[in-house]
Amino acid sequence: MSRKNVLGLINTIVANSCKCPAHSHNYGSAAPTASQTGRMEYAFEMSASTVRFGPGVSAEVGADLRNLGARKVCLVTDKNVVQLPSVKVALDSLARNGINYEVYDETRVEPTDGSMWHAVEFARGKEFDAFLAIGGGSAMDTAKAANLFSSDANAEFLDYVNCPIGRGKEISVKLKPLIAMPTTSGTGSETTGVAIFDYKKLHAKTGISSKFLKPTLAVIDPLHTLSQPQRVMAFAGFDVFCHALESFTAVDYRERGLAPSDPSLRPTYQGRNPVSDVWARFALETIRKNFVNAIYQPDNLEARSQMHLASTMAGVGFGNAGVHLCHGLSYPISGNVRDYKPKGYSADHALIPHGLSVVISAPAVFEFTAPACPDRHLEAAQLLGAEVRGVEKADAGRLLADTVRGFMQRAGIENGLRELGFSSSDIPALVEGTLPQERITKLAPRAQTQENLSQLFEKSMEVY
């Protein structure tokens, strides 16, 4: 599909869909169908990977794969992580348990459609019966794609990619077991059914979303966090930060749209609910107590362990409630990078780390969304350590935005989009790149026009 045709489809969807998130229901990865009941949503469901947490627990992964009946495993990682103790511990465990394996270490930091397809072709030719992902979200998402497309050997890449960029096909094939072992405290991908990548043709991020993509088991070993460089810890931590804030302030599940006629069609991202709130609150409180120490004290196992746990907890929360504007705006930001290369990263290409692209708009976003649910924004600010006594509801957005800025400043985050290489002249392209993200931007508690999106990008040019 050409860029012109895709943008035409996007504009048609935008023009013909209600802007109020309480009456819009195209949240799944698939194309809209006449499958609603005619009544508003009345239920939510929670699903997540099995989680095992503890220092040194990664040594058990070989036994897990043996118990799953695996005989030939594809270990997906990247060129940096493959040299770290996390991979050595896993390989030793596989050897002790008699598990054959091959290592795929070509994962690209911030994957593209091309890099994911490279992994798919590797997996399709090997007849693996299980996958083990070790690394950050890039490795875990790449492993999800390799698992899916090697299980459906006839599928084309865009078949399963979210509409409107892809065809949004529902997953009906049986996937192989996937164990995810995160080495960064950020994406929460070890518990979610989402795989994100840059679609280079449109300079936009998109992904594949399905509960069937969730890893079979998440092995959360805080010892691996001690190898995270300072900047990686900071940027990944802000992904956790925004996962928790966005899921906590997302539209209520009962206001998301019409209930499906078949419960299997209930979307991956359903809106905030009482159970997702538990995970978000835990993550926000943990961030308040540990985030800054985890950045600047790399040997502080307690702080880094707690952030690792917060990442998983926030992942379970947003994996069901969803995220909204910070993530929706982040995708064209990272997709339109020119020459920015973050300090502390050994990437051979320009990139804006996902957590940085997400948090850079957060102050503007939460000032914008606060009028829709000020009590939620005040509670979020309080969970992050702000004093809320005497604060009027009208000031909820300002307080939460200032609280977010405080964390950004302490972490040494760049002062807005200008420092990432953008200017006001880029805003039309950034807005255009946000339009395909309706699947998540509709989960914001306040509807947006294109003018609103332009204003959010403009306010994010400078943060402090």
UniProtKB/Swiss-Prot annotation:
Instruction: List the Gene3D superfamilies.
Output: 3.40.50.1970, Dehydroquinate synthase-like - alpha domain
Alphabetized UniProt keyword annotations: Mitochondrion, Oxidoreductase, Transit peptide
| Keyword Mitochondrion attributed | yes
Q: Please list the GO biological process terms of this entry.
A: glutamate catabolic process via 2-hydroxyglutarate
The molecular function terms of the Gene Ontology recorded here are: alcohol dehydrogenase (NAD+) activity; hydroxyacid-oxoacid transhydrogenase activity; metal ion binding
Transmembrane intervals: none
Q: Which PANTHER family match?
A: ALCOHOL DEHYDROGENASE (PTHR11496), HYDROXYACID-OXOACID TRANSHYDROGENASE, MITOCHONDRIAL (PTHR11496:SF83)
Its family remark reads: Belongs to the iron-containing alcohol dehydrogenase family. Hydroxyacid-oxoacid transhydrogenase subfamily.
Q: What is the name of this protein?
A: Probable hydroxyacid-oxoacid transhydrogenase, mitochondrial
Origin organism of this chain?
Answer: Drosophila melanogaster (Fruit fly)
> Gene name, please?
T3dh
